[in-house]
A protein has these predicted regions:
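Glycine-rich hexapeptide-repeat left-handed beta-helix
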Residues: 2-118
Length: 118
């Protein structure tokens, strides 16, 4: 495994073979990180959880629960922790939130008008 500068690893942690951890990562105690994992800079991992083999954690992600499936995980900003693919969908939807709100308001107005016409 490769560790960058400023990496803090708590008590009783296990880091799997062939994993890479970038700078300023914090891993709390009794966490198990699988083999062939990468953890991006500034990420934080709470204690007493397990991370499966072949997991890739994006920089500045806060991992707050165990990860049992391989893949890339992202939790940037105030969005909930999720798979990277789901995070990308969420980010795309957030960009269109104003449009969705306008459409919803239009539908609500139409429903109100239909109810008044009865």
């Amino acid at each position: 495994s490769k560790l960058d500068d400023q990496v803090m690893i708590g008590h009783n942690c296990r880091i799997g073979a062939h994993s890479a951890i970038a700078g300023c990562v914090g891993i709390a105690g009794s966490t198990k990180v699988g083999q062939r994992c990468t953890i991006g800079g500034g990420a934080g991992i709470v204690g007493h959880i397990e991370i499966a083999d072949d997991v890739h954690i994006s920089g500045f992600t806060l991992v707050s629960k165990s990860i049992s499936q391989p893949g890339t995980y992202t939790s940037i900003s105030s969005t909930p922790f999720t798979t990277h693919a789901d995070w990308l969908k969420l980010a795309a939807h957030l960009r269109h939130l104003d449009t969705y709100a306008e459409k919803l308001k239009t539908l609500q107005d139409k429903i109100k008008q239909l109810e008044q016409d009865k």
